[in-house]
Regions:
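C-terminal substrate-binding subdomain of Rossmann-fold SDR/epimerase-dehydratase oxidoreductases
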Residues: 10-15, 19-27, 191-313
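Adenosine-cofactor binding site in Rossmann-like domains, unifying the SAM/SAH pocket
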Residues: 25-50
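Conserved sequence/active-site signature of Rossmann-fold short-chain dehydrogenase/reductase
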Residues: 43, 111-112, 167-169, 181, ...
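NAD(P)H-binding glycine-rich loop region in Rossmannoid oxidoreductase-like domains
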Residues: 45-85, 94-97
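SDR active-site strand-loop-helix element
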Residues: 10, 35, 60-66, 103-109, ...
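Conserved beta-loop-beta element that borders a ligand/cofactor-binding pocket
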Residues: 107-108, 145-173, 183-185, 194-202
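Active-site helix of classical SDR
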Residues: 136, 140-143
């Protein structure tokens, strides 16, 4: 990409999209196009095609998505599949029709099988069944990355895909019914501290292993890949480090300063037992993460405190 290339970031108000915009601006890119949902509903094919025909972006970062944690995924299976599939197909297809030079599709590590080898290499995609708690979202994301691959094969496009691990950081969603584990913990321990509660109850038994990547590090990788990678196979984005949910809750409590008890509701689901990405491909390309987990949680908590309305989204 040239510094004045016309770059469209879809989903710029979300955590990932806003981080990509910050990273592009930090690196000196000056021609960044964004649209709010009110200005451009990506689930409307006619509106998306009109936008691409008029604006003709040269590069596209597709970071728009309908996202949520276990509760949201289980209660709105059809919505998660339909909304994500239609918006990504609309954007990718319109980009192809209007001669976009390169597109980068942002997915999720939930695309990999529930019992995938650990750490999970890119090659394990579609080798066995998915985790049921987020299967609808995963299937939509798999469809998006495969559509990019098939366009490359049939029409010679240069569309790439990136599969991040669990993300956190500025502009996250802290709503208890619609967010992921780390922002939920930040909100829960903050509210427990403020209320002086003696204990906090968390789901499951704390045994699942998880990996977390600070969103600004992901954004740095996204720009790096747009400039340095072409290929049909997706690229994993993570740290290559994991910890138990129990250790994570203790770390969040430490950062926030909550000193009460942590209890576990074992009647609630754990989710996938282990999720660690094989990040050797990104490393071979010359990229590695920068932000350690405790430092990132401190930055995320500062963002939460400075933007209390995010907890209501």
């Amino acid at each position: 990409m040239e510094k004045n290339s016309k770059i469209y970031v879809a989903g710029h108000r979300g955590m990932v999209g806003s981080a990509i915009v910050r990273e592009l601006q930090r690196q000196g890119y000056t021609n960044i196009i964004t649209r709010t949902h009110k200005e451009l509903d990506l689930t409307r094919q006619d509106a998306v095609e009109k936008f691409f025909a008029e604006e003709k972006p040269e590069y596209v970062f597709l970071a728009a998505a309908k996202v949520g944690g276990i509760i949201a995924n289980q209660s709105a299976l059809a919505d998660f599949m339909y909304d994500n599939m239609i918006l990504e197909m609309n954007v990718i297809h319109a980009a192809w029709k209007n001669g976009c030079k390169k597109l980068e599709f942002l997915g999720s590590s939930c695309i990999y099988p529930r019992m995938a080898p650990q750490p999970m290499p890119e090659s394990c995609l579609l080798t066995s069944s998915l985790e049921k708690t987020n299967e609808a979202y995963a299937l939509a994301k798999i469809s998006g990355l495969k559509y990019c691959e098939y366009l490359n094969r049939q029409y010679g496009t240069d569309y790439i895909s990136v599969m991040p691990t669990n993300l956190y950081g500025p502009n996250d969603n802290y709503h208890p019914g619609h967010s992921h584990v780390l922002p939920v913990l930040i909100r829960r321990f903050h509210e427990a501290k403020e209320a002086g509660l003696e204990s906090v109850t968390c789901w499951g038994d704390g045994s699942p292993l998880r990996e977390f990547l600070y969103v600004d590090d992901l954004a740095n990788l996204c720009v790096f890949l747009m400039n340095n990678y072409s290929g049909n196979e997706t690229v994993n984005a993570g740290t290559g480090k994991e910890l138990t949910i129990k250790a994570l809750t203790e770390l969040v409590a430490k950062v926030i300063g909550y000193q009460g008890r942590i209890e576990w509701d074992t009647t609630r689901p754990n989710g996938t037992p282990r999720k660690l990405l094989d990040v050797s491909k990104a490393a071979k390309l010359g990229w590695t993460y920068k932000t350690e987990l405790e430092d990132g949680i401190r930055l995320a908590y500062e963002d939460f405190l400075n933007n209390p309305m995010r907890a209501e989204r």
